[in-house]
Amino acid sequence: VTCNFDDSSFKILQNDLVFFQPNYYLYPLMISFITRQLKDPKDLLELYCGCGGFTLPLASKFNKVFATENNRHSIRLLKESIELNNLSNIETARLSDDETASALANERPFRRLENIDMQSYEFSHILVDPPRAGLSDETISLSRQFKNMIYISCNPETFLRDIVKLGRKIESIAIFDQFANTKHLEVICFLR
């Protein structure tokens, strides 16, 4: 898929084994909303990155991006997309949300991270785009370490549950109607 955002274009590889934003017309508007809200971006930690639908277009807004995803097909396609687009500031790892929290807390070593210098990151933002089940308690705890949080949700019910648990201030919020005439909505929220 070739995606155009503002004055740039990206090729994002996908197949039927991975998730990608379903509404091609709203997708650039979602990216635009996120980029307009960014304040003082340094490095980005992204959980549930999928095949890179947000990773690739947001990479130019951050010094470095560390993107994690548990689906091996998604990570493989993301790595290929990074090469295809000649991006050098993105590192990836196949880690679940809980494994990412463990890795950042230095609770145990991961061979999958042996070539990644986690200490070199100066994370200013965390971006989460969880499945419909929402965030795990470990991810909620991890996110509290970050001043800025971008929460993308396809399930308003679990989003509301998580917002209460997070106890953060909502800076801005946008709702995208991905499937007209249905109850399915995509929420993008900036939290501090």
Report each predicted region and the residues it spans:
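Rossmann-like S-adenosyl-L-methionine
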Residues: 1-192
